[in-house]
A protein has these predicted regions:
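Soluble, non-transmembrane alpha-helical interaction regions
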Residues: 1-140
């Protein structure tokens, strides 16, 4: 497992312990609220994260602090890659593979996942080098 995968796994494991719940139907919503010992009209006591995912409202500050810390750790790992051939390359290679670039050829999906734009990549030699190296696998 490379550096990017280790950090991604570490962040996923921490996120998984956060206590979020999913409810995409009324029945599941009621069940979720019951599991939290809340009435179905206690809407002010929950926070909607999107994609049918909820957390308790009291956990919102801790959740966003965790997400911000994850973002900073990722940015630090990018900054510490002096050439773009380490963490940055691993990051692009992993996400290209994960998002089926070989078949879809949708770089925008990969960049959205990484919260990057083509402008950022083109203006940063390390990012450009890492992406170019990762894309070589898909050249025909």
């Amino acid at each position: 497992m490379n550096k990017y995968q280790k950090l991604k796994l570490q962040h996923q494991e921490e996120s998984d312990t956060f206590g979020w719940k999913f409810a995409n139907t009324e029945i599941r919503f009621i069940k979720m609220m019951n599991e939290w010992n809340l009435a179905s009209d206690d809407i002010d006591k929950i926070y909607y994260l999107g994609n049918a995912c909820f957390i308790l409202a009291v956990d919102k500050p801790a959740y966003f602090a965790m997400k911000e810390r994850h973002k900073k750790e990722h940015q630090q790992a990018i900054a510490q890659d002096a050439t773009g051939n380490g963490y940055i390359y691993q990051m692009f290679a992993y996400e290209l593979e994960t998002h089926s670039f070989e078949f879809l050829h949708r770089l925008d999906i990969v960049l959205d996942t990484l919260d990057l734009t083509l402008e950022q990549i083109n203006s940063n030699a390390k990012l450009k080098r890492g992406l170019t190296k990762a894309l070589k696998k898909y050249e025909s």
